Amino acid sequence: TARSRGLGDVYKRQLLGGFTLVRSANPLDVVTLNSPLELVVTIIHPEIEVKTADARAVLLDKLHLKQAIAQTANLGALVTGLFKEDYELIRRSLVDHIVEPVRSMLIPGFNELKNRANEAGALGTGISGSGPSVFALSKGMDIAQKVGLAMQKVYDEIRVPYDTHISPINSKGVKIL
């Protein structure tokens, strides 16, 4: 089952929609967070495989206290920014000090994707899960579409096939049609 493979929290987050915070994996405790109505996500998925085992293998076993403090501060600020609909606080808090520096090496053109997305107006850009998808959050659909074009240009230049998806944050989760 998904739970026995350690993926239960992933599937539950996908079913709930929106932003979720996994407070505990055992027992599973997931908190749903509100998000601003104008928040839009752009996701670019390079057609490459990054195995979860490989993505986990590059993670460091130990953290420096400064990294943990910075990451925790950014998480708290992100939750606050979402709650207060403070886009500038969201922008300042979308910095990953722990996972992104090592996992970004597994994703072709990651740094250029991030730079161009942010230059195009993204609030912030990061790795979705264990990769290889890269997400960018934007205020409004117009900016999100510009961000998508900027990211696509990077992969066009380095000849990496990709899919792109742009959507408002779905706070409702999965629906049966």
Description of each model-found segment:
Residues 5, 20-34, 62:
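Active-site glycine-rich loop that binds ribose-phosphate moieties when present
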Residues 43-105:
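Active-site rim beta-loop-alpha module in soluble metabolic enzymes
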Residues 9-12, 28-34, 79, 124-125:
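A generic local secondary-structure boundary/capping motif
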Residues 1-11:
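Single conserved hydrophobic/aromatic residue that forms the stacking wall/gate
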Residues 8-9, 16-18, 37-40, 121-123, ...:
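Short coil/turn connectors at secondary-structure junctions
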Residues 13-17, 23, 43-47, 127-129:
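Short beta-strand segments
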Residues 82-177:
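Glycine-rich, charge-dense phosphate/pyrophosphate-binding loop(s)
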Residues 14-25, 136-139, 177:
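Short beta-strand-to-turn element immediately C-terminal to the catalytic PLP-Schiff-base lysine
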